[in-house]
């Protein structure tokens, strides 16, 4: 019984300390920000399109920031990182991909 409990504790400790390879940080370099700005200038949607500064923040806080900075965004689903999504593009949607702690792990963008 104690061994099972120890395995469960170990699993949760590892799960909470796991950071996905998809997570991007500003420390990844200016090339990431540069690519985002280039894509943003070609966009057909109005308002801010990317929020790289929201990496690592809680999803509900990020959702509030996105709604405040671009009122045309009306659909902000919160999804576990790696969840399957459709490939259609909508100017009113930003998907927030989160880890098991609920922190944003991918750059939120209009999709």
Curated annotation (Swiss-Prot):
Keyword annotations: Protease inhibitor, Secreted, Serine protease inhibitor, Signal
GO CC terms: extracellular region
Gene Ontology BP annotations: response to wounding
Acyltransferase among keywords: no
Gene3D superfamilies: Trypsin Inhibitor V, subunit A
A single MF term (Gene Ontology): serine-type endopeptidase inhibitor activity
Keyword Secreted on entry: yes
Positions of the pro-segment in this chain: 24-36
Signal peptide: 1-23
Site residues, Reactive bond: 87-88
Domain of life assignment: Eukaryota
Location relative to the cell: Secreted
Family label: Belongs to the protease inhibitor I13 (potato type I serine protease inhibitor) family.
The protein's name in its UniProt record: Wound-induced proteinase inhibitor 1
């Amino acid at each position: 019984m104690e061994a099972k409990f120890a395995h469960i504790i170990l699993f949760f400790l590892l799960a909470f300390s796991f950071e996905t390879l998809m997570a991007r940080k500003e420390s990844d370099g200016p090339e990431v920000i540069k690519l985002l700005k280039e894509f943003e200038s070609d966009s057909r949607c109005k308002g801010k399109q990317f929020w790289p500064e929201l990496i690592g923040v809680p999803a509900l806080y990020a959702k509030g920031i996105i709604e405040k900075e671009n009122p045309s965004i009306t659909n902000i689903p919160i999804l576990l990182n790696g969840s399957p999504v459709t490939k259609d593009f909508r100017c009113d949607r930003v998907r927030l991909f989160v880890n098991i702690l609920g922190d944003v792990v991918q750059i939120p963008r209009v999709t």
